């Protein structure tokens, strides 16, 4: 344990500023308090850049996901079980931008935690809750897309509003109960008492997680990931087969006679493709962080602080990516944004506006 503590502390001493950017001599987070954490502040230039980059991510996550939620909840055309899942996912990303990223920005740039011990624990709970809630939502969305693509005509009777509500409830309750229970019972610190003692200082917010719980955390990420990869592989095969069938039929009939089933299948495949990109973005953003967590827990916290900070912020930035993906691939979302931004959403009967091209 002593070696593990030494390894961790030596890793923490190689701060992001010392590795990447020149910084002034170390200072204390609280100059007039005994037991204050040490900080190595950035010079003004890099400090301003980091605040701009991290702050932009937080603003984009809040505003972008607020637009997604407003669009889906306001416009009646978007009131579907699948879209309610998307809105709930946007809510998780919105809360990351509101309750996690702004405070992490200050911690990452200043090297200190100025928001109290109570919110330090809440901050960590929010971080875990919203991450797992996102991956559970994406897992259910992938299953929804599989049903829609494999049999689009009976899909409305299988994935109903009730089923969507149960998926949303499960995603939120399990994530919140797990994250808060783990951190508030102190189970994550079992066997790491010496490390926790070494980390404790005024102005710090380091949450230690032992090997057992790091492994469980990784499984909670890995299992839904494998489910999504399997489901989207099947969706890809079905979509490929449907495209081949449509191509064969097009040689025998004119495009004008395209069946209703084919049109529905084409629309569902496009939706599956867009949401598949969102899933891929989530996995690419969070997988490096979880792999690093496993490596750190079993090799004595060897990751330099600047590497950890980079991985954390790549993961955080995922919360800002989905609105950009929707805006790029969904014409209806671009139209909804225009109506919201211009204030036309406040007009009477705006909720029945047609968002889909003829």
From Swiss-Prot:
GO molecular function terms listed in the Swiss-Prot or TrEMBL record: trace-amine receptor activity
The keyword Methyltransferase is annotated on this UniProt entry: no
Ranges of the Cytoplasmic topological domain: 69-83, 144-166, 234-274, 334-358
Residues that carry a glycan: 34, 210
Cell compartments where the protein resides: Cell membrane
Keywords: Cell membrane, Disulfide bond, G-protein coupled receptor, Glycoprotein, Membrane, Receptor, Transducer, Transmembrane, Transmembrane helix
Extracellular side: 1-47, 105-121, 188-212, 296-309
Residue spans crossing the bilayer: 48-68, 84-104, 122-143, 167-187, 213-233, 275-295, 310-333
Disulfide bonds: 37-201, 120-205
Classification via InterPro entries: GPCR_Rhodpsn, GPCR_Rhodpsn_7TM, TAAR, TAAR_fam
Membrane topology (UniProt): Multi-pass membrane protein
GO biological process: G protein-coupled receptor signaling pathway
One annotated Gene Ontology cellular component of this protein: plasma membrane
ATP-binding as UniProt keyword: no
Protein family (similarity comment): Belongs to the G-protein coupled receptor 1 family.
Protein function: Olfactory receptor specific for N,N-dimethylalkylamines trace amines. Trace amine compounds are enriched in animal body fluids and act on trace amine-associated receptors (TAARs) to elicit both intraspecific and interspecific innate behaviors. Ligand-binding causes a conformation change that triggers signaling via G(s)-class of G alpha proteins (GNAL or GNAS).
Domain notes: In addition to the well known disulfide bond common to G-protein coupled receptor 1 family, trace amine-associated receptors (TAARs) contain an unique disulfide bond (Cys-37-Cys-201) connecting the N-terminus to the extracellular Loop 2 (ECL2), which is required for agonist-induced receptor activation.
Matches recorded under PANTHER family: HISTAMINE RECEPTOR-RELATED G-PROTEIN COUPLED RECEPTOR, TRACE AMINE-ASSOCIATED RECEPTOR 7A-RELATED
Record's protein name: Trace amine-associated receptor 7a
Lineage start: Eukaryota, Metazoa, Chordata, Craniata, Vertebrata
């Amino acid at each position: 344990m002593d070696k593990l503590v030494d390894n961790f502390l030596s890793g923490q001493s190689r701060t992001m500023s010392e590795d990447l950017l020149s910084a002034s001599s170390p200072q204390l987070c609280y100059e007039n308090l005994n037991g204050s954490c040490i900080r190595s502040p950035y010079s003004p230039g890099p400090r301003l850049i980091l605040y701009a980059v991290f702050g932009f991510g937080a603003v984009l996550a809040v505003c972008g996901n607020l637009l997604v939620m407003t669009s889906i909840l306001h416009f009646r055309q978007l009131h579907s079980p699948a879209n309610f899942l998307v809105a709930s996912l946007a809510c998780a990303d919105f809360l990351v931008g509101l309750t996690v990223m702004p405070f992490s920005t200050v911690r990452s740039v200043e090297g200190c935690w100025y928001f109290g011990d109570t919110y330090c624990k809440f901050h960590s709970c929010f971080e875990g809750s919203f991450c797992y809630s996102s991956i559970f939502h994406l897992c259910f969305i992938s299953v929804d897309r599989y049903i829609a693509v494999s049999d689009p005509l009976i899909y409305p009777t299988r994935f109903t509003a009730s089923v969507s509500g149960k998926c949303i409830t499960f995603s939120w309750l399990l994530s919140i109960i797990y994250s808060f229970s783990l951190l508030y019972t102190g189970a994550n610190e079992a066997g790491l008492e010496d490390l926790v003692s070494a980390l404790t200082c005024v102005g710090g917010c380091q949450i230690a997680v032992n090997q057992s719980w790091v492994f469980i955390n990784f499984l909670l990420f890995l299992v839904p990931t494998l489910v999504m990869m399997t489901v989207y592989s099947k969706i890809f095969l079905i979509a490929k087969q449907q495209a081949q069938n449509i191509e064969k039929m097009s040689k025998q009939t004119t495009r004008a006679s395209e069946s209703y089933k084919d049109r529905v299948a084409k629309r569902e495949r496009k939706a599956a493709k867009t949401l598949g990109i969102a899933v891929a973005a989530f996995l690419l953003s969070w997988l490096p962080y979880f792999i690093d967590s496993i490596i750190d827990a079993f090799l004595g916290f060897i990751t330099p602080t600047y590497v950890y900070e980079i991985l954390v912020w790549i993961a955080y930035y995922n919360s800002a990516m989905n609105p950009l993906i929707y805006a790029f691939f969904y014409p209806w979302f671009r139209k909804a944004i225009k109506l919201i931004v211009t204030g036309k959403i406040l007009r009477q009967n705006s909720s029945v506006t047609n968002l889909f091209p003829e």
